[in-house]
Structures are given as C-alpha cells and as structure tokens.
Amino acid sequence: MPPRLIVFDLDYTLWPLHVDCSVTPPLRKDSKGRIVDLHGQKVRVFPDVPEILERLKREQYALGVASRTDDPDTARQLLGLLDWNKYFSYQEIYPGCKVGHFNKFASRSGIPYKDMLFFDDEHRNIRDVSKLGTSHSSTCSGG
C-alpha cells in the first residue's frame, strides 16, 4: 500500500547545505534568477529533487517537510524562493526532536504514522520517528 503522507527533511536531503550555518541570510534571487545569500554565494538543491517533487504532486501524494534547523526563517525563505510551498501541505520547521513534528503531522492530517514515509539523512531522526511506526529511508547525506 502506498504512503498517504511523504515527509522530507530539508538539509542534506533536499538541498546540499545546512541553512543555519552554510548561508548568510537574507536570501534573494539575483538578476539571472539564481538564489544567492547576502554574500552572493549560490544556493543550490540536489538536481533530481524538483522533478521528484513535481511527480509526487502530479500523482497527488500529500507531502510534508520536517526540519530541526536552528534558522527556521531562512529555511522557509528558501522554500518560498524555490516556489516549493506549493508541494508541501504540511511544514514543521523548528529545533527539537522530530517526533514532535510527526505528532503534529498526524494531528493536522488525520493520517496514521503507519501511512507516512520519511526521508532523512540523519540516523537519529530516522530512529526516533520509526518508533512511531512510520516507514523511512535514509538519503545517505543527500538527495
């Protein structure tokens, strides 16, 4: 049975950086439409991610993001600049154990943990959330 909610971590899962220490906010688009930080450093995503998100949306999966970042504002800003908010109906972006994030997903969506699939690059997050009964996959530090 396919998952009813697919949840992604952000840092080193959807993009190859930590938003709380790898870039300097504010982020913006430059004259060529590239996303850059305060110093002009380009901010990139893993190459296959946009196509994957578009396909999942087309196939009508519910999607969420769960991030423990210490800079939720910059993470949200990057999601907005990428125009990715359209993909993620559920967003829990704040420091803390991801069990709390998933408790909110279950409460807000009505979807049981067993029907959620979680992608993350950090084993501790996968270990914590798997105790709830979610399915999971490690991204091996990216993409």
Segments and roles (model prediction):
Residues 1, 112-113:
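Short helix-loop-beta connector
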Residues 80-84, 108-110, 129-135:
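Short, surface-exposed basic-aromatic patches at helix termini and helix-loop junctions that form
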Residues 12, 102, 118-119:
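Structural signal for hydrophobic/aromatic residues that build the beta-strand cores
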Residues 96-108:
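Short loop-to-alpha-helix "cap/lid" segments that border enzyme active sites
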Residues 113-143:
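Acidic, Mg2+-coordinating phosphoryl-transfer loop and its flanking beta/alpha structural elements
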Residues 50-58, 106, 126, 130:
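Surface-exposed amphipathic alpha-helices with a cationic face
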Residues 75-79, 102, 129:
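Hydrophobic packing residues within well-ordered alpha-helices of enzyme cores
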Residues 1-96:
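Alpha-helical substrate-recognition element adjacent to the catalytic core
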